[in-house]
């Protein structure tokens, strides 16, 4: 992990503070944390505009604007009193060595899960989800995937390290069950017979939130769920700072309502990926990513009952 053997964060792309102004915890495996935030500054699998290695820092920086509220609207409790959350800084790996990255991220995730922690991760390009799925499946078994994106990322293009191929590899490796997985906000071409339920952006924008959530819950069933949110699921008007923006996406309001409605699911791991601050305007992409991350923590805190 970032700081093993050190008392500082030695990532070249991180901040000096954690998400929501949390202090950085340099030995997350030994803490009493419920959820551990990990920054994953990796964008070597990007096919379009690079730069999302700076996503974790951008999300953390703008999250300072969210830290002042005790109870985040519309919730009636302070998530920091319901959950013990720590930020362990950024994963450090040999830059230019994608295999070293995969090995170190999977090892870090396996150690956290073995210690009883859950993970909220900030990418980085979407390829980072694959080693995270490997670690989570080793711990929880085959999972359902709830995937927000403009792209299905199920493309069999023969590339080992590609941010468009993770969900082609994951079913083949037995990590997730496509029959119990749903992809939300899709608006690019994809193979129609890959086994996933695809809710394209047109129907997600036109149908009611309650109707969509009912379908998601039916598809997922009782399986453990991994939740992954590619920020390009949102329309570029809400999230311009990403590598492969696609017009016609979700609004931030609809995305927040959908994430909020996932509270009943057995979510065992979560990530937000593809924030590329070089293309952002007034930090709005980083802000919506940080807000979605906070919402993800709130749906976990809501399971804990009263303070």
From Swiss-Prot:
GO molecular function, one term: agmatinase activity
Gene3D superfamilies: Ureohydrolase domain (3.40.800.10)
GO annotation terms (biological process): putrescine biosynthetic process from arginine, via agmatine; spermidine biosynthetic process
EC number: 3.5.3.11
Catalytic activity from the UniProt record: agmatine + H2O = urea + putrescine
InterPro entries: Agmatinase (IPR023694), Agmatinase-rel (IPR005925), Ureohydrolase (IPR006035), Ureohydrolase_dom_sf (IPR023696), Ureohydrolase_Mn_BS (IPR020855)
Binding site for Mn(2+): 126, 149, 151, 153, 230, 232
Pfam family for this entry, one: Arginase
Keywords: Hydrolase, Manganese, Metal-binding, Polyamine biosynthesis, Putrescine biosynthesis, Spermidine biosynthesis
Known pathway: Amine and polyamine biosynthesis; putrescine biosynthesis via agmatine pathway; putrescine from agmatine: step 1/1
Cofactor (UniProt): Mn(2+)
HAMAP family hit by this protein: SpeB
Function of the protein: Catalyzes the formation of putrescine from agmatine.
Family listed: Belongs to the arginase family. Agmatinase subfamily.
Cross-referenced NCBIfam families: agmatinase, PRK02190.1
Protein name (record): Agmatinase
Species in which this protein is naturally found: Sodalis glossinidius (strain morsitans)
